[in-house]
């Protein structure tokens, strides 16, 4: 579906003084909840903002859990990276050291603004050993990858389930990743939801039902999945 995105800088969205962090990287308790919610919202719904700018000046290491997702934002003062992984835990107060990621991970998203290699440095991913991240170049584009770990309860990673239910590699890369980052539970402020970020009822279903819904949607609206991919590439929405 067509979506209108109103862009804003990190300074406007999150305050010109950064994220209410002191010089020792500890969070002000009275301000952390709001800032964590804003950071989480950017990671889920507007990752290009995080790709374009560090969240604050200087080196930092910000980690917290929000709505079941564990978020980590790091910088050495020159380059920066961020990622989030679903762990299913309760919201926690941020710490300056990243905690080990849960082994039941089904999907994650991450970004690094360093050179375009096939993996980020080990110190940036030490808490997410099950995540296969793809680094992105220094542009406002967003790059993410689903976890390669499998889960008996879900039948494999999100990408594996998508491909097993009729989805294609091309559709995953051209539609799913730009729209939702591979997160089947993604919901943006305008109400678009799921892997394909539509307002269709199947957008809140299982990965299998979302995959089949996306294929039917592409066939009925564009004539074929390939035609839908071409439209998404040309227009930036579908």
Curated annotation (Swiss-Prot):
The keyword Signal applies. The keyword Ligase does not apply. It is found in: Secreted. Residues 1-29 form the signal peptide. It comes from the Bacteria. Its EC number is 3.2.-.-. Residues 116-131, 139-157 have a biased composition (Low complexity). Residues 115-157 are annotated as: Disordered. InterPro entries: Lysozyme-like_dom_sf. Keywords: Glycosidase, Hydrolase, Secreted, Signal. GO terms for molecular function: hydrolase activity, acting on glycosyl bonds. One of its GO terms (cellular component) is extracellular region. Is able to cleave peptidoglycan. Belongs to the transglycosylase family. IsaA subfamily. This is Probable transglycosylase IsaA. The lineage of its organism: Bacteria, Bacillati, Bacillota, Bacilli, Bacillales.
């Amino acid at each position: 579906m067509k979506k209108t995105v109103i862009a804003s800088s990190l300074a406007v969205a999150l305050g010109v003084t950064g994220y209410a962090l002191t010089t020792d990287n500890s969070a002000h308790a009275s301000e952390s909840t709001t800032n964590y919610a804003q950071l989480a919202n950017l990671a889920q719904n507007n990752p290009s903002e995080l790709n374009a700018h560090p969240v604050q000046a200087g080196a930092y290491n910000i980690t917290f859990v929000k709505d079941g997702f564990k978020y980590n934002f790091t910088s050495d003062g020159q380059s920066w990276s961020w990622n989030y992984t679903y762990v299913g835990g309760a919201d926690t107060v941020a710490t300056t050291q990243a905690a080990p990621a849960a082994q039941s991970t089904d999907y994650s998203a991450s970004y690094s603004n360093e050179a375009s290699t096939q993996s980020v440095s080990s110190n940036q991913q030490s808490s997410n050993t099950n995540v296969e991240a793809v680094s992105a170049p220094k542009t406002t584009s967003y790059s993410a990858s689903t976890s390669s770990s499998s889960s008996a309860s879900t039948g494999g990673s999100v990408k594996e389930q998508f491909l097993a239910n009729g989805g294609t590699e091309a559709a995953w890369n051209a539609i799913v990743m730009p729209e939702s980052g591979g997160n089947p539970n993604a919901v943006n402020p305008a109400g678009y939801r799921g892997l394909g970020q539509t307002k269709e009822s199947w957008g809140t279903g299982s990965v299998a039902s979302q995959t089949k819904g996306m294929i039917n949607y592409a066939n009925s609206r564009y004539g074929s999945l390939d035609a839908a991919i071409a439209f998404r590439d040309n227009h930036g929405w579908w």
